[in-house]
Amino acid sequence: VVVSDGFSLVKTDAEGVFSLETTDRSRFITLYTPTGYRHTTPFYVDIREGVPSSVSFGLVGADDYTGQFIQMSDIEERTYLDWMDDFKSYMEIKKVDFVAMTGDICYAPGLQLTGSEFNTDDVGVRMVYTLGNHDLIKGYKDSQGRDYGEKPYEDQFGPVWYSFNIKGVHYMVTPMLIGDATPSYTPDDVYNWMRKDLESIPEGTPVVIFNHGVLGNTEHLVLKTDTQTLDLSEYHIIGYIYGHNHVNYHYVNKNGVQMICTIAPNKGGNDHSPSSWRLFTADGEKLTNELHYYPIPKQMAATGRVVGG
C-alpha cells in the first residue's frame, strides 16, 4: 500500500508498516486506497501542527464496488439550495463508488458550505474534491512566509493532490496550478509527484486524472516546466476529467485519451446546456459516461398563434 506526504511515496510492508521521511513543506500523510478496500478511518492525517511519532490508518476489505462514479463541477455555491437535497435523494437510490467535485467550489463561503453540508457523511458516499482557480484564497501565508492560497481548501478537504484505486483503475486527484491567489506549491511539485505516483503502479494500469482545468493541452497532455517534461502519453491514461470551461465537452485526443469536461449541476453551461452531472462507468480499460440532467420541475407550457382573422 502506498503512503505519501505529497513529495515522497513509500510502500508499506506485508504487515502494513511503513517509514516516511517528511519535509518542512509536508502537510498531510495520505494512504492511497488500494483496490478492494475501503477506509475505516480518514484517508489522510493532518500534520500541519506537527508530525506524530506514529500514524495509523484503517482499511477493510470491500467487494461491493460498482466501478461507477459521478462528476460535477463549478458549483460555486454559497447558500444551501434545493438542488443539493435533490442530489442527495438521487444518491439514496443510485449506488456509486464516489462523487468527484472538480473544482470551483468557490471562495471561503463555498468551501465552508460544501465542507459542512455536502461531505461524505451528508451525501452518503465518498466525496472527492479537486482545487479550482476560485478555490485559491488571498491573505494566507505558511509558516515559512510563502503564499498559501490553498489553506482554506486544505482546512475543509485535506491534501490537494493524492491518488486512490478502485476495481483496478488508478485515480489521480490534481490541483489547478494558478488562480485567484498564489498557492504554496509549484508546477514542478505537482509534476514530480505525478511522475512518482505513476511509476508506483504496475505498468499498463488504467489511469483517470481529475483536475479543475487541463494540465498541458487537450491534444497532447505534455506537462512542461523549465526543469522537466512529463509526457502523460507514456502512461495508460484512459480519461482526463475536468470542469472550468462551463461546457459539456467530450473529445478523444491523438493519444486516445478521453478529455471530458462537465458543467455545473445547479446553473447550466455557457453552451446553453441544462444543469447536469455526469455518471461514469469504469470497466477495466473501458471508460463510458452519460449525462444526467437536473430534475426539471413538473410544469407544462404551451405557445400558439391565431391563424386568420
Q: What feature does the model see in each segment?
A:
Residues V2-V17, E21:
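Short, acidic Ser/Thr/Gly-rich low-complexity loop/linker segments typical of extracellular
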Residues S200-T218:
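Short acidic, glycine-rich surface-loop motifs adjacent to enzyme active sites
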Residues V17-T22, S54-G58:
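Exposed aromatic-hydrophobic patches
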Residues D74, G103-D104, G132-N133, H212, ...:
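Active-site glycine-centered loops adjacent to acidic/histidine catalytic or metal-binding residues
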Residues T33-H39, F43-D46, L113-I201, D226-G239, ...:
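Extended active-site neighborhood of metal-dependent phosphoesterases/phosphodiesterases
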Residues T30-T40, Y44-L113:
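N-terminal active-site segment of His-dependent metallophosphoesterases
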Residues T281-G309:
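A short C-terminal boundary segment appended to hydrolase-like catalytic domains
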Residues T66-E76, G168-I178, V208-F210, Q258-A264, ...:
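Active-site-proximal beta-strand elements of phosphoester/diester hydrolases
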